[in-house]
Amino acid sequence: HVGRKMVEGGRCAEPAVHHFTESITRWGITTARMKTGTPVRIDKRSVHFEDMEEQPGDSDFHQFSYMGDHRILKQLPCWTCYTNKKVHDILKSGLDDSPLYNGQIQSTGPRYCPSIETKLVTFPDKEQHPLFLEPEGEDTNEMYLNGFSSSMPMDIQLKALHEIPALRDAKIYRPGYAIEYDYFDPTQLKHSLESKIIKGLFFAGQVNGTTGYEEAGGQGTVAGINAALHCTGDKTFEMKRDESYIGVLIDDLTTKGVDEPYRMFTSRAEYRILLRQDDADSRLTEKAYELGIAKRDRYDWWMEKKNAIERIIDFCANYPIKKDEINPKLEALGTTPLRAGCKLIDLVARPHLNLQNLSEIIPDLKAAMDAPANRKEEIADTAVTTTRSGRCMNPTLHSMSRPSARART
């Protein structure tokens, strides 16, 4: 949808799919419609960057992979600017031709990324809205104007853009547009993402009522694994709510369903303290290896870390601390002295102490923390987090220290 103009289409630069919905709904699978939108794409050579504020890329990198060092891609800056009253007046003048407000689109869109026209209607008191100009890639002139998602007529979009000082001469590759699409009721799926109605048919991604790349990718991983297991007759693979955000997402979809495009947030996970970036390897590596989707070197890398963590935790749990010997050192570190002897693990649990500074005053701990030089900090941090959360790498103790996967807040 661009204004009153409607064109059939599939994924970006692909044709529409016809009759697919009809071919499976006749078996009892239910369907409904949702919408999404996208902003205008701008030629960066036509942008006056001197009238924008630069937002540089991150310098503190946290990589997805735990395996060694990886090349850091060149960081390209984003740029910010704002709409103004003239922009708003132009957009408001075209609301009669907006598919969102002339009855052309009836389906539900995503709550958390509204179109620019929706912002104007919903927040009429706002004099400006922030816009973020983002590069589409390192070797292209195409830029994405985040915050300006729209399905207004192209001439209205362009006229409004030209009232923004930095975009006064902007040239566009394509206008913003809205899309309506079919989705299928995810409560008709098992946790494996196999249909309850048609055996061997798996659903993943936007067709399940989700929005977002990561949401689709996570479902695709689970559906793909289970499709392969289905072909070999093996037991299905399912993730629980306390094991991964993918598990939370799939459980929400299959038990609660959706009435708007679903996006994954940490707030949806009642066990989010267990679902951290720094413990993804402990939660998922062994499962992935058993499924054959993690290579041996990744498994060995994790087992080395796991054994080192267990060694440190075991040492802390059994190493006795005498108050007379440790108190002067604790006072020097600015922490409360002990009233009685304890185990080292009780000191580790103090939030303002860490293994690094404790190892400087307890030589035996320093020896126990011996690990690959490039992984000492990673292993020590994980050991501390594991200790403080009451979790242990021992499966029996681990299962006793966390709540049932099916519990609900």
What are these regions (language model features)?
Residues 1-290, 294-295, 299-300, 304, ...:
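Residues forming the flavin
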Residues 268, 285-409:
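Extended, charge-enriched "interface" segments that sit outside catalytic cores
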